[in-house]
Amino acid sequence: MAVTKRAGRRAQGGTQPAKGAQGVKKATFESGKKREVGVSDLTLLSKVSEEAINENLKKRFENGTIYTYIGHVLISVNPFRDLGIYTDAVLESYKGKNRLEVPPHVFSIAESMYYNMKSYSENQCVIISGESGAGKTEASKRIMQYIASASGGSSSNIQKIKDMVLATNPLLEAFGCAKTLRNDNSSRHGKYLEIQFNNQAEPVGANITNYLLEKGRVVGQIRNERNFHIFYQFAKAASENYRSTFGIQPPEAYTYTSASGCTSVNGINDEAEFKETLAAMNLIGLTQAEQDNLFKLLAAILWIGNMSFVEDKDGNAAIADVSVPNFVAYLLEVDAESVVKAVTQRIMETSRGGRRGSVYEVALNIAQATSVRDALAKGIYNNLFDWIVERVNQSLRAPQDAARTIGILDIYGFEIFESNSFEQICINYVNEKLQQIFIQLTLKTEQDEYVREQIAWTPINYFNNKIVCDLIEEKRPPGIFAALNDACATAHADPNAADENFIQRMSMVGQNPHFEQRQRKFVIKHYAGDVTYDVKGITDKNKDQLLKDILILLQKSGNPFLVSLFPDPVNTDNRRRPPTASDKIKKSANDLVTTLSAAQPSYIRTIKPNQNRSPTEYDEKAVLHQVKYLGLQENVRIRRAGFAYRQTFEKFVERFMLLSGKTSYAGDYIWQGSAYDATLCILRDAGIPQTEYQMGTTKVFIKTPETLFALEHMRDMWWHNMAARIQRAWRRYLAYKTECAIKIQRFWRLKRGLDGLKEIQFRDSGHKLLGGRKERRTYSLIGYRRFQGDYLGCNNGSGFGDFLMKQIGVTDKVFFSCRGQLQQSRLGRSSVRVPRTFILTKNNFYVVAQQIHQKQLVVTNEYTIPVRNITHMSMSNLRDDWFCLNQASSPYGDQLMWCVFKTELAVQLRVVKPGVDIRIGPQIDYFKKQGKKASVKFQKTTTLQTKFDMYKSGSVQVPPGAPPNSVSKETPRGRAKGSRGGAPSRPAARGNAAHTPTPGAAALGYQQHQPGSAQPASPRARKAPPPAPNSRGNGHAESAQPQAYNNLQPHYQSLVNPRSGQGQQQQQHHQAYQQPTAAQPAATSYSPAPAKAAPPPPPPAPPAAPAAPAEPTYKALYDYVANGLNQLSISAGEQVLISVKEDQGWWLAKRMDGSEEGWTPAAYLEEVQGGAAAPPPAAPTAGGASAGASLAEALKQKQQSNQTLGAGIADAIKARTGRPADDDDDDW
């Protein structure tokens, strides 16, 4: 994982500030963002009224925004145009988002259903309601589009199921939709599509339930409407084979497609849609033989409609053109004479006392013959449509039981025409049932649940349409359907008599306030408005049965496909009344209610803005009427006063137990109390205010959706954090293994005398490169110094160095990488040194900046210096660490940089560019910007209080260093194993123990204390405890860590996110490393028992001199203004306390009253003489004697450490740790 650090103030000045360096983005004018019009959720209206709702919908419609919420209910206004809001890009933007993160959209409803199905293992459904032409079918198609895209699974079978589900749309639209006066693609049947999913939330099947096809449309339509789409598609785009075989003509040639005077529609391309229909048939799996039979029967229906009648001499019906029934007989594969007889005659049977009587053949008049002809066409099409639905289900059937389902209801909308008959009663009855479900689940059930759960609640009045549903479907008292069935049973032979009987029976339902009788018409006051129905022909439509003569004719067909459409054998002796159309629609509606009630519903309420299908017209009066009958105002009020989410205690705990450490551990449920108490515990531990929830008797109620989304987000992040924790542990383990292997390899090379030969050669080439022209630092000359090059591990393939390379997009091999500093100019102020990372590859030298942006570490490539542009590298002749890579030309000028490994950088630069010149002199000349030359002079001084160089106003003060002709010391050799002076070896470190710092770590020693870096105060080194009495001069081997490593620790702490577990663990890790341990006795484990008793311990040393005050007082010589959050501003003459002194020129100071603390430049301070007197020394104790002995031993070891180092790499490191801080006056 990436290493992060605390965010500090923005770095001041600089020629190229890193993008996103602040937590707050720069304010910009969002010209491309679409302006919000109105409110996106009607619950946010300042005034709740039907007029205010209508006005808000109008504003959004005119702005091209068609979707609005009422809580979780979506309001959709039909735009009658393509708004471009259903593209793949828009769809992708809604994946994984809750409804508050994105604008209202049908995709958001689909995402919510799919997420709830996966998360709560509950079946989902969406109920789309509204009047005809409001956009219900389009909404259902878009939900299917989203679910097919968002659902998981990439196997061929799952993808095939998705494609087949989408293919049901064009197929069922062709056979079940038609052009009406109000809608060019009106659904003339109801469809409930259930998409079935497995346990992985992948679609594995589907099932379609069909409701009440309007088969009367096959034989007649009102003016300017059309038959079902498939007839026009087939008549216009049939293949030549079908035209010659089935006698297909243009739609104008058929009575059933041309009588209404509309065969073409603007915006509908019948030829192109016929191709889509054929493609859908092929995709679903209809064979060519099945398609041929299907189109053969469609041709038969068209030709049946062309059979016309004339009166014979007896006034009965006779066929006008005999060739038409002959061709119909050819298509139906029956005898032509049988066809003529079936449509012109009827077999009547008399009975006496329950016994069969005489059989008569009764001739039909023209009206009766036309009715029989139309019944034949309607029966064939109705059964053909049912076969298509069943065949689609057969292809979509899941191979195994589905775990969960998502249901999509697309059903005809509420209809009010000038002339309304039985079809409109059935359609409006189904819409009443859907409205009843909506009221039951969103209004009544919700308020009843509040009362049952004892939740504080103010009841809200609403209209319950159950009284209207009872008016239509009830048996006692009898409703309209019951009266219809009684009329059909009483006067079944004469349709006119049956209609009269029905008028008389309607007097029994006249008591209902929502019913009015008007002569041969009646009015039902529906929730959507008053509708007047015509009684004429209503009982005949309710019978919904084919004459037995027709059934016998069809079952004698030589076409097995046609026979299979009418599988029930004709029982001529059965006297029982078959189910009527009202019985079927009532049963279907109740089954639909049962299915929908078993799932968690979502709602889409569609609104039709005008009756002219205009994309710009908004009929306020018509929309206001829809707002009223849809009950949107009551819905808004209940939503504002209610709760967004409710769940039983058990299911809530099962879902969110991970949010509390008291209820779960490692994903297991550990709570021992009740589910009620566990729910309270989870809500408290998650930080949910008590005002955001109420506890019922069996359920918890969450008031706002924001609270629920917050709980869900915290639950998702729990899994993310657990995965990150496992990844960190694994990476720590791999890093530890690698480090152990490296230590073993290094030790083995050391024993064989091969340790760092290549690095030593590089180091020695550095001496030759300088050529005695530059003073050296002490640490540059020690025997253990190696030129490693890639100190950050950029070539390792993992770790922080690899992370840097990926962030700046560099893949080349790295020759040199190290941390350093950059001298950054500031307008009107002194320049400042800012920490940077330097990376050298074969082609470029990179200056990389790291900053905190929105609590995330942001790495940017600040400067790229091409190696080919570098003319020479400039350095001073003193022991400082400044250098400059001078370029032939650069728009940003040359950069003055500081790096402790500048000699090694020069060597590596010579490797990648052999001809580069290394210029060493008393000053560094460079170009601050293009055409502006500058120089920095270097002066040696012995009065500098800091141990590093100091830059000020173009001049650098440098302490004296080693002579220029100095070379590295020899690598120390290990002692013999039996040496008395050797330190006892320590046991190997465990996996979590601290690791020995590498030489590259010293490069971090200076930069973290500079202005602009965001590090905490540098921890003080702890005093070593006294050694054990039996230890023999081993105090130096067990002392504290070297100063360079102590300087390194604040940098690591500043890069680690303090909120993460990793940061805390890293801090503990370094503290554990700093804590010195007492030396262990060497007698029992490593040497035999002495022959004589051990000599008594030496007498305790005299008390040490009084220590200096813990926090000496200093006075400020100049004003200093802080440049970072970790710095302290001081005024000239102000006195401060110094708690930590660092070698790099920065001291940790705090106000005299302790109110503020921060880093301040040491050069600005002067110690105040005669500070507070030190407290008297404590009386010597045994512990004090041990401490004195330990100090004496440490001083003795200091004298010996320059002569002999410990055996092996471990002893060498121990020897380094034994040096007091006063000797660490130099870095590498």
UniProtKB/Swiss-Prot annotation:
Underlying gene: MYO1
Superkingdom of origin: Eukaryota
CDD domains: MYSc_Myo1, SH3_Myosin-I_fungi
Protein name: Myosin-1
Function: Type-I myosin implicated in the organization of the actin cytoskeleton. Required for proper actin cytoskeleton polarization. At the cell cortex, assembles in patch-like structures together with proteins from the actin-polymerizing machinery and promotes actin assembly. Functions as actin nucleation-promoting factor (NPF) for the Arp2/3 complex.
Domain IQ: 720-740, 741-768
Post-translational modifications reported in the UniProt record: Phosphorylation of the TEDS site (Ser-358) is required for the polarization of the actin cytoskeleton. Phosphorylation probably activates the myosin-I ATPase activity.
Stored PANTHER family: MYOSIN, MYOSIN-3-RELATED
One GO MF term attached to the UniProt entry: ATP binding
Region span, Disordered: 1-27, 953-1040, 1053-1109, 1169-1228
Chief place where the protein resides: cytoplasm
